[in-house]
Amino acid sequence: MSSKIKTSGGIVIKNDKILFIRKNNRWDLPKGKLEEGVNSRDTAIVEISEETGLNTKDLLILKKLIPTHYHKKVEGATIVKKTYWYLVEYIGDFNSPLVPDKNEGITDCRWFSFDELVLVLEESHERIR
């Protein structure tokens, strides 16, 4: 038996930096489940905003990226997770505070330079490396 989960999220960029969230002691990209009747574009923007505190009006989708697929077994059932990804530019004030959504288990949000990515990816999920 298998079940399918669809999610949507973004690689958020600003000033040559990428935004990551910290959840379950790992760095990850902001994303969330697609709700019935809501498209993947809108879901990506809403989830980024909810998880980081950035205003939806300051999030500009630049490009749709290739979706990823992730399979895992839970209690004998296979779960297939498809994530729609977007390249998103943050056009707001770079010094605006980031507010992690603690209700979702997010403990930190932080901008990282491309040079710092090696260190960040060491503490991330294998599927985003």
Language-model regions, residue ranges each:
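Short, intrinsically disordered, charge-balanced linker/junction segments flanking boundaries
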Residues: 13, 124-129
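N-terminal strand-loop-strand
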Residues: 1-30, 41
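Small/flexible residues
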Residues: 24-25, 83, 129
